[in-house]
Amino acid sequence: MMRRTAPIFSVATVKNLIDGKFTESKATKFYDVINPATGSVIAKCPQSTPEEMRAAVENSAAAQVAWRNTSVGNRVRVMLKYQQLIRENSKQIAEILTEEQGKTLGDAEGDLFRGLEVVEHTCSMGTLIMGETVENVSAHMDTYSYRQPLGVTAGICPFNFPAMIPLWMFPVAITAGNAMLLKPSEKVPLTSMKLAELALQAGVPAGIVNVIHGGHDAVNFICDAPEIRAISFVGGNAAGEYIHARGTKNGKRVQANLGAKNHGVIMPDADKDHALNSLIGSSIGACGQRCMALSTAVFVGDAKKWIPELAERASKLRPGPGNKNSDFGPMITKEARDRAIRLITESEKLGAKVLVDGRNVTVPEHPNGNWIGASVVTDVTTEMPCYKEEIFGPALVVLTVDTLDDAINMINKNPYGNGTSIFTSSGIAARKFQHDVDAGQVGINVPIPVPLPYFSFTGSRASIRGDINFYGKQGVQFYTQVKTISSNWNPKFKNTGATVNMPILGKDQ
């Protein structure tokens, strides 16, 4: 059991969720769930057995038959109750999230709230799932289409957003009439288990959300199981490319959000305070472990004179435990911390300057935490490791260019295309940037342009695999299939014999 002033959730051994029951796994192999701020083991996460995974997917397939025939209104009512329960338990969920992932409580609450917004949007499913109709495509004939659920779907979640990403996935999938087999990150399974527990309390039927655990074997099972029709994945490039290739080979839909290298372009006419504060907050916040972190600053022309002030402001941020008054928490693992340090050090050897150096930062009260401080690295070129690779840590890489065209060309040559931002007071510059830049999400004086769920998360190029994006209208499209019906209610069919020619619709007959 985790030690708390008040118990939140039993986490001695994380359980599977199958058929509405939290059951102990018969696994013989377990992952340690480690508090990254203290280095202490707070739970054991099983590698679900093949028999447990098969039982989970078969149960989901059986349960989905009745669920798909439940009216969309009743499915929405379950989501209305669910969003209420999330709100009522938000403090508790944030505390669980902070303990297993390391985020500050404020950031954990934001993580949860951005997922809650997706749950709220699913409460409009009756409108989102509407089909189309054309009357009189031919005499007495109508054609109409509607969206039907796929069946069993799967979600494979990352460590960096333990609440938001699962809530991108299963609420949309199940409100559209599917079942979902969820696999949380083995590093942060506790938040997902709490969200699943609340889903059952809200009235989600047994089997409609099942949860298994594991690593490579669990991923392979999801990619190969014939019952699973679609896979939603968020995580790194290697895993995402693998899941997309293996899943699509087996005939499944796959949407995979992968790595990123998001650039923030600073024009000389930008509001200096807003631009610098935005760069620092979006690159250092969450210890830089966001797929939409603005990790790369591109100063255009005379804006480069602000770089020393940028460094001064960044140097004031301090890491620490998420439940204290810290600016940001630790890295998720020691390996992730060491990798970030390596990329900075290798680039320094190639000529980069480390104006703010967080590589040797310590937090005395928690010496075993995965600590790294804020870093600002300047004089960077596009050939350096800190630019070519995603650091995924609290480091801001700084480059300078002469013109906006130079900045756009740099961004477009980078293989990633998750998001980008420009800071300017010129509508002309902003319009040119949004039109010419090749990125899925563009911010204008907005540092992290992740859209609200009325729209969809729209990465591009090497940052996305699959052609249907997350949440919003596209999320509904991903979890449904279109059926088109042509009906003929002619009051008096003519007995003209069998017609062997291709029928021509659209003519009065």
For the regions a language model picked out, list residue spans one by one:
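Rossmann-like NAD(P) dinucleotide-binding subdomain of oxidoreductase/dehydrogenase enzymes
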Residues: G131-L276, N325, V401, G466
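Residue-level signal for inorganic ion chemistry
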Residues: G39, R75, L97, V119, ...
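ALDH superfamily catalytic-core signature
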Residues: A238-T381, L404, M410, I444, ...
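Structural signal for hydrophobic packing residues in well-ordered secondary-structure cores
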Residues: Q64, R68, Q83-S90, A94, ...
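Glycine-rich loop-to-alpha-helix module at the N-terminal edge of alpha/beta enzyme cores
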Residues: S40-M130, H140
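Short, well-ordered beta-strand elements within core beta-sheets of diverse protein domains
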Residues: I42-S48, A63-N69, G155, G264-M267, ...
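Hydrophobic face of amphipathic alpha-helices that form TPR/SEL1-like repeat modules
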Residues: M2-A37, R359
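Conserved C-terminal structural/oligomerization subdomain of aldehyde/semialdehyde dehydrogenase
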Residues: T38-K44, V204, I228, V265, ...
